[in-house]
Amino acid sequence: DSRLKEFVNVFPNNTGTFGYDAWGFNLKKIKNNIRFVKYLYESFFKVEAFGLENIPKEGKCLIIANHSGQLPIDGALIGYAMLSNPSGPRAPKAMIEKFFPTVPFVGNLLNSIGAVIGDPVNCERMLSNNEAVIVFPEGVRGSNKLYKHRYQLQRFGNGFMHLAMAYDTPIIPVAVIGMEESIRSYANIKPLAKLVGLPVAPLVIPYIFPSKAYIYFGKPMYFKNDTQNES
């Protein structure tokens, strides 16, 4: 529909001859997948987003969120909330775990719709390009935690803070509620994870629960790069 076409037009068309940008993003793939994400956002999870006015309309920023739900669905929902933001739509990038390219088809698919390997160099380049970048500092510690540990924040990596200070970049804190219930893991089968070369092998109920989701975008936070006073 016309609204979806408007969303697609928000994405920068800075792709090369073969239709891909430097990180593997492909505008055609977005056109093919955005309708499904719209369904997840509006109908399946019935997402309510708050604080959208806090997202800068332009310029670099880091979207720092909690992570849960086994699959990167929460990242897709955050991205759609930003893309459909009535206060000023933005097409963000999202940092993903380094093991995703080892999963057949998944890595290329995620790259094609705006996901980028979670490497500091990639993030630096995107911030230099004035991108809005979604980061989950908990990583797999958050997304693959057991259901009994739901809503318990896991340790945050601090790489995003160093980048925010080094590149004078505002941090937009984000809380996602509801995805803990979407896919429920009851155990991590470590021998299997080691065998297949993945960080985790969750024992899950093979069903995605249509849990109601809420996304809260906080006000921008700025941190001064004061390395001279570090001890």
Where are these regions (language model features)?
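Non-catalytic C-terminal accessory region of glycerolipid acyltransferases
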Residues: D1-K29, R125-S231
